[in-house]
């Protein structure tokens, strides 16, 4: 928001300079983005009157004038401005004046005619970019008065960033309140006496959507001169706030908007059919806006309509049909309070952002409408003339926001600020902020002012007290904390340790959104129910993820589209699963997931290009699982997952509980997601693994190890992992290592069977094993395999 410093000082004028004022506003939480002078540096420019204006004898586009600047004689000045005319009050740079850019005015001759000064435009004085003509001053401007003094050009524009919670500061009065509070200075409330109705004309107003529009005020003003010029003082105030003057009626509503922060609108009363109806739009209803664009409305959009059609989008933009134009004689002034939720998002939907929508979305003072409509009526009558009717008030007190009553405890105040502020100061600060305060025993009950709807809870009052007291006035205190040794369980496995291992294996950690595309998620988890967001960032981010795969696979596609074909990434994060037994109906599980694709190794002259396969990912995952000490209890079982290849995937079980999946992405899913080549994924429920088994130290055997190899033939559907597990179980005291080193299918092995070559490492910690003992242990393993898997030794 941009405003004039002098306009602010009309409301409150603390005895501090511009720099101190800007710093004070920033420290109050309204960050000042810039302070700029409203005009360039110049002197010697005074008010003059064009007494004579004749055509230059030697130039078609020049005029020869005689100008009275209040001196002993008239000045001869040559001027080329098209609006120069006799009787016009102008800004005259006399001989010796210095204009912006260090341009000194001297006596000269232009096409043979003497010129003793310059009739200035706004651009020549560095006031604005308007160079279309010379400045036209009011007829009552006193001759010879310094133009800087007359136009009050020793002023600055201050631009501030207003945070969403401080919508009350989107008007001069709101900033003035804060400055008054900070300086303990009086706020000069402007006289806004009610305008007495001189006519009885009204217009029927019906509010059908009372929740969206709790208060709607209207007032008929008849017989106005819409072509009356806007006073220069008002134009200047608007300009210094970044608002262009349009016509007197629009300028008045903009002036009230900037001064009080209350948006207003003026309708051409004669174009309203029947009366005003505040209602929700009909689905697909259209309205042509003031800028000529056509908006197609949704049923959740609030509109101002007459008895037959929509006239404008409430709180956002007026309509062209009922807009004020050069022929307007009678207007209806509108001043309303709209519920912020009924306005939020509607402007963006139509590609609009107006000063009105900016304020209504954040909220305006629900008690301000009477003051604003009286102020606008008085200004309109003073400028355009006419007669005003009575105020038409349609209010629903039940739906208007209520003032919050908040209890501030001394203990909470001291604890959060870390400094004791005297009771009298606290009470004084709250009252200066506009609160109605009742003092109690070590507490205050404060009723928030109507313009501060951001005051809702105790912490809000703590913030306000600290802000007004001054953050710089709170002494620095060194932080004191007791050094309490935290407890550490040996069984706790840090997720950071797992991440470090994956980093060491060439994986990169990524963080993806918890919001995913529901269509993509349905491809990965067909038929699964997901939590849908009522107000998503976009349609593609409207569902909460059921697994980390949605984000990871999208990341793979993103990288592949940028010629990064070798990808190794992992992520840890929450998934959100609807569960009626969980708190709030949503179960949140911490997951660990990873994806690999592309070549096994980076390109190298001494390495063959080999694409990653199931066992690459399984090996990396087993290394992670080994950190938990539970690898021996992990089983990979063939189990269907719609997102994975049925022949190259497995469910991961910890004892008898499934904790995740691993496998190659299903070819059909791969095609639909535009994945380039084989992609492998895994996902685990981390909390099932975080409590690791503490390793038990044991003596390393000093005796020699013995290796024996066996080849067993088993059915094709028997997992090799089960064979190895059985061998370990049978030879628990002596078999210290079991390894599968070959798988054979073909000649000598029947169809539907496979030959597994297994090495058994046997060793004892107390003695050297005899050959008979070794043979007996191997025989026990073979016998166990025959009994459980119908295995046979291969010849």
Curated annotation (Swiss-Prot):
TM region(s), chain numbering: none
Domain FDX-ACB: 701-794
Binding site for Mg(2+): 454, 460, 463-464
Reaction(s) the record says it catalyses: tRNA(Phe) + L-phenylalanine + ATP = L-phenylalanyl-tRNA(Phe) + AMP + diphosphate + H(+)
Entries under SMART domains matching the protein: B3_4 (SM00873), B5 (SM00874), FDX-ACB (SM00896)
Localization per record: Cytoplasm
Record keyword rRNA-binding present: no
Domain B5: 401-476
One GO term (biological process): phenylalanyl-tRNA aminoacylation
Source organism, top-level taxon: Bacteria
Domain tRNA-binding: 39-148
GO cellular component: phenylalanine-tRNA ligase complex
Cofactors that this protein relies on: Mg(2+)
Pfam hit, one: tRNA_bind
This enzyme's EC code(s): 6.1.1.20
Cofactor note: Binds 2 magnesium ions per tetramer.
Keywords: Aminoacyl-tRNA synthetase, ATP-binding, Cytoplasm, Ligase, Magnesium, Metal-binding, Nucleotide-binding, Protein biosynthesis, RNA-binding, tRNA-binding
Family as reported in the entry's similarity comment: Belongs to the phenylalanyl-tRNA synthetase beta subunit family. Type 1 subfamily.
Subunit structure: Tetramer of two alpha and two beta subunits.
PANTHER family, alphabetized: PHENYLALANINE--TRNA LIGASE BETA SUBUNIT, PHENYLALANYL-TRNA SYNTHETASE BETA CHAIN AND LEUCINE-RICH REPEAT-CONTAINING PROTEIN 47
Protein name: Phenylalanine--tRNA ligase beta subunit
Organism: Salmonella choleraesuis (strain SC-B67)
Highest classification ranks of the organism: Bacteria, Pseudomonadati, Pseudomonadota, Gammaproteobacteria, Enterobacterales
Gene name of the record: pheT
């Amino acid at each position: 928001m941009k405003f004039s410093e002098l306009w602010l000082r009309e409301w409150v004028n603390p005895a501090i300079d511009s720099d101190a004022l800007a710093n004070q506003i920033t420290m109050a939480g309204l960050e000042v983005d810039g302070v700029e002078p409203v005009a360039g540096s110049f002197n010697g420019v005074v008010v003059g009157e064009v007494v004579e204006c004749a055509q230059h004898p030697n130039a078609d586009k020049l005029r020869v004038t005689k100008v009275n600047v209040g001196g002993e004689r008239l000045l001869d000045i040559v001027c080329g401005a098209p609006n120069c005319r006799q009787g016009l009050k102008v800004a005259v740079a006399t001989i010796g004046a210095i204009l912006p850019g260090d341009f000194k005015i001297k006596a000269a001759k232009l096409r043979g005619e003497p010129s003793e000064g310059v009739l200035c435009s706004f651009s020549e004085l560095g006031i604005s970019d308007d160079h279309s003509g010379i400045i036209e001053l009011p007829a009552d401007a006193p001759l010879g008065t310094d133009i800087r003094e007359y136009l009050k050009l020793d002023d600055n524009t201050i631009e501030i960033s207003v945070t969403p919670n401080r919508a009350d500061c989107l008007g001069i009065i709101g900033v003035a309140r804060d400055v008054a509070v900070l300086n303990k200075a009086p706020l000069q409330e402007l006289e806004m006496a009610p305008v007495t109705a001189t006519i009885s004309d009204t217009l029927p107003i019906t509010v059908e959507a009372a929740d969206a529009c709790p208060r709607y005020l209207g007032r008929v003003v008849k017989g106005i001169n819409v072509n009356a010029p806007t006073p220069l003082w008002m134009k200047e105030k608007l300009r210094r706030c970044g608002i262009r003057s349009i016509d007197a009626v629009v300028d008045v509503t903009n002036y009230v908007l900037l001064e009080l922060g209350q948006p207003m609108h003026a309708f051409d009363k004669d174009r309203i059919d029947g009366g005003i109806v505040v209602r929700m739009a009909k689905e697909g209803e259209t309205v042509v806006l003031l800028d000529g664009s056509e908006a197609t409305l949704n049923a959740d959009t609030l509109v101002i309509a007459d008895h037959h059609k929509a006239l404008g989008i409430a709180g956002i933009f007026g309509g062209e049909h009922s807009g004020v134009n050069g022929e307007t004689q009678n207007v209806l002034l509108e001043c309303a309070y709209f519920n912020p939720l009924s306005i939020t998002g509607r402007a963006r939907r139509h590609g609009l952002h107006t000063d009105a929508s900016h304020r209504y979305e954040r909220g305006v003072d629900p008690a301000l409408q009477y003051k604003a409509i009286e102020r606008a009526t008085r200004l309109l009558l003073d400028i355009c003339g006419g007669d005003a009717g009575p105020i038409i008030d349609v209010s629903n007190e039940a739906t208007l926001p209520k003032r919050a009553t908040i209890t501030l405890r001394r203990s909470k105040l001291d604890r959060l600020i870390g400094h004791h502020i005297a009771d009298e100061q606290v009470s004084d600060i709250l009252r200066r902020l506009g609160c109605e305060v009742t003092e109690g025993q070590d507490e205050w009950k404060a009723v928030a002012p109507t313009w501060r709807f951001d005051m809702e809870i105790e912490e809000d009052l703590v913030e306000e007290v600290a802000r007004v007291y001054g953050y710089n006035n709170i002494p620095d205190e060194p932080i004191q904390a007791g050094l309490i040794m935290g407890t550490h369980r040996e069984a706790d496995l840090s997720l950071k340790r797992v991440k470090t291992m994956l980093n060491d294996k060439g994986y990169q950690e990524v963080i993806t959104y918890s919001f995913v595309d529901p269509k993509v998620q349905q491809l990965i988890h067909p038929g699964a129910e997901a939590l849908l967001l009522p107000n998503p960032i976009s349609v593609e981010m409207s569902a909460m993820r059921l697994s980390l795969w949605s984000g990871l696979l999208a990341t793979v596609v993103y990288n592949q589209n940028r010629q990064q074909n070798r990808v190794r990434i992992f992520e840890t994060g929450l998934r959100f699963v609807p569960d009626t037994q969980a708190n709030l109906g949503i179960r949140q599980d911490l997951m660990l997931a990873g994806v690999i694709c592309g070549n096994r190794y980076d390109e190298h002259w001494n390495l063959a290009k080999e694409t990653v396969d199931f066992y690459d990912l399984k090996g990396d995952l087993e290394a992670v699982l080994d950190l938990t000490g539970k690898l021996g209890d992990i089983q990979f079982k063939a189990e269907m997952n719609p997102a994975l290849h049925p022949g190259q995937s497995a469910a991961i079980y910890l004892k008898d509980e499934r904790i995740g999946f691993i496998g190659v992405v299903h070819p059909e899913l791969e095609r639909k997601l535009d994945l380039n080549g084989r992609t492998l994924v895994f996902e685990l429920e981390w909390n099932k693994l975080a409590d690791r088994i503490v390793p038990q130290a044991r003596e390393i055997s000093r005796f020699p190890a013995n290796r024996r190899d066996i080849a067993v033939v088993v059915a094709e559907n028997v997992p090799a992992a089960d064979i190895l597990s059985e061998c370990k179980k049978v030879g628990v005291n002596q078999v210290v290592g079991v390894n599968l080193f070959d798988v054979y299918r073909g000649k000598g092995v029947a169809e539907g069977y496979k030959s597994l070559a297994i090495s058994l490492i046997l060793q004892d910690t107390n003695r050297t094993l005899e050959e008979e003992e070794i043979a007996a242990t191997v025989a026990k393993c073979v016998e166990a395999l025959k009994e459980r898997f119908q295995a046979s030794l291969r010849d």
